[in-house]
Amino acid sequence: MSACQTPLIVALDFPTRDAALKLADQLDPALCRVKVGKELFTSSASGIVESLCAKGFEVFLDLKFHDIPNTTAMAVKAAAEMGVWMVNVHCSGGLRMMSACREVLAKRSGPQPLLIGVTVLTSMEREDLAGIGLDIEPQEQVLRLAALAEKAGMDGLVCSALEAPALKAAHPSLQLVTPGIRPAGSAQDDQRRILTPRQALDAGSDYLVIGRPISQAADPAQALAAVVAEIRS
């Protein structure tokens, strides 16, 4: 497997295996990792992960597991056995759920995936949280969940880059994975709390997830190269 030399993760947000692999064939695994989400995994099952790994990519399995502790832990274990590089769970599942995931990984031999907690989805704003009974700012809820994640021994968090400075200050050991990244001039789409790649890295993000600006570009390889140039400038 080629070691990726950048913090970039390209989201393979496609409905079919063929479409995802068509994009992957245009990308360099030395310049990016790839993310497999719910739609693609549901349509393609574990075979898509195997195919991407065979092409040299490190895979972030973005299924945001959230269930009772044992069920979630077994799902995380299954993901590890597929050979994924990163897997995530919802921090809102609680301390016992996250701790169970950490423990099940510690008991297995071989490479360990990064275990990442999802705090507040980047599409959510204060009014969205209020609608589910949380009358607080997203940043406050992120910090609450981050404290639980660190206590459970998680490797990092998915968060908006706008939350990254506060998270790095409070929890410097946690690696921060930031979606909602848009190169300068890109449309915001359905991600609300966004920054450019350079801004996100400067804010403290460790990994950057980029989707449509690369996946829907006329030339995805060129679009990826432009983002790499931006973060290296």
UniProtKB/Swiss-Prot annotation:
Assembly notes: Homodimer.
Return the protein name: Orotidine 5'-phosphate decarboxylase
- List the SUPFAM superfamilies: Ribulose-phoshate binding barrel
SMART domains in the record, alphabetically? OMPdecase
Q: Point out the gene that encodes the protein.
A: pyrF
Q: What's this protein's family per the entry?
A: Belongs to the OMP decarboxylase family. Type 1 subfamily.
**Active-site residues per Swiss-Prot or TrEMBL entry:** 64
Reactions catalysed, semicolon-separated, are: orotidine 5'-phosphate + H(+) = UMP + CO2
Keyword annotations = Decarboxylase, Lyase, Pyrimidine biosynthesis
Looking up HAMAP family in the UniProt record yields: OMPdecase_type1_B
List, alphabetically, the PROSITE patterns matched: OMPDECASE (PS00156)
Q: Which InterPro entries does the record associate with it?
A: Aldolase_TIM, OMPdecase, OMPdecase_AS, OMPdecase_bac, OMPdeCOase_dom, RibuloseP-bd_barrel
